[in-house]
Design a protein with these regions (language model features):
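Hydrophobic, small-residue-rich membrane helices and short re-entrant helix-turn-helix hairpins
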Residues: 1, 141, 166-201
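Selective recognition of specific alpha-helical transmembrane segments in multi-pass small-molecule
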Residues: 3, 7-12, 16, 160, ...
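Select transmembrane alpha-helical segments in multipass membrane proteins
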Residues: 4-5, 40-53, 144-156, 204-211
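Juxtamembrane transmembrane-helix boundary signature
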Residues: 5-37, 49-53, 57
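Transmembrane alpha-helical segments of multi-pass small-molecule transport proteins
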Residues: 48-52, 73-95, 113, 117
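Inter-helical loop and helix-membrane interface segments of multi-pass membrane transporters/permeases
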Residues: 65-81, 122-150, 174-184
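Membrane-interface loop-to-helix entry segments
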Residues: 84-85, 95-125
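Hydrophobic alpha-helical segments and their helix-loop junctions in multi-pass secondary transporters
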Residues: 89, 111-143, 149-170
């Protein structure tokens, strides 16, 4: 019943991240630099603090989630799982020195593996297609339950992540392009296509999580 929240959140994320791409390509500034340069100091500091809180909240959920997954799969104690997760995060950061493109390729491979696992599970579950499609129809009554409302808020926050907007506006500048208007337009089209593909795959994974949980 909350698949429509996943779809709506994905559309919002596509819109906001496309705007961040446009900012980065058109001005050469990422979102943080643009805020620092164009906004009063009284606005900049709260925005910075909110971004830090969002990063900590997201990382905490991912850290604990990975530790729980390691416990379920291999029986590892939670503290050991947390340490292993923190270590592999540092390893990924260290891989940046080999170039951002290689790091992107590694992340894409991992995401593809996760997507393949969910695809296999969906084939094994064989959910009712009509029920799944019906979940894409917005229903406000599904949010009257407090637990459903909290879940919907979590889905929205996990899809439209504030710190991702800062990150994406910076990452689009790692690609080299000429300074002419035509090349910038081409870079913008490529960045928008990249955003749509990435968030469409994220939508499929998030939708699969809900369907599998319901099954």
């Amino acid at each position: 019943s909350l698949l429509w929240v996943v779809a709506l959140s994905s559309l919002m994320a596509v819109l906001l991240q496309s705007l961040c791409c446009r900012l980065g390509i058109a001005t050469g500034l990422d979102l943080a630099q643009a805020c620092r340069r164009l906004l009063p100091r009284g606005w900049v500091i709260p925005l910075w603090l909110l971004a830090e809180v969002a990063i900590v909240a997201c990382d905490l959920a991912e850290l604990v989630g990975t530790a729980l997954a390691l416990q379920l799969l291999f029986g590892l104690p939670l503290p050991v799982g947390v340490l292993l997760t923190a270590f592999d995060t540092l390893v990924l950061l260290g891989l940046q020195r080999f170039g951002i493109r290689r790091l992107e390729a590694l992340v894409i491979s991992l995401v593809a593996l996760v997507g393949a696992c969910f695809a296999v599970e969906m084939l094994l579950l064989r959910p009712d297609v009509a029920s799944v499609l019906g979940g894409l129809v917005p229903r406000m009554d599904s949010l009257r339950n407090s637990s459903q409302l909290y879940l919907a808020a979590g889905i929205l926050g996990a899809t439209v992540m504030p710190h991702n907007l800062y990150l994406h506006s910076s990452l689009v500048q790692t690609r080299r392009w000429s300074t002419g208007p035509e090349m910038r337009q081409r870079a913008l089209r490529f960045a928008n296509l990249d955003t749509v593909i990435a968030l469409s795959l994220a939508f499929l994974v998030n939708a699969s999580i809900l369907v599998l949980a319901a099954g």
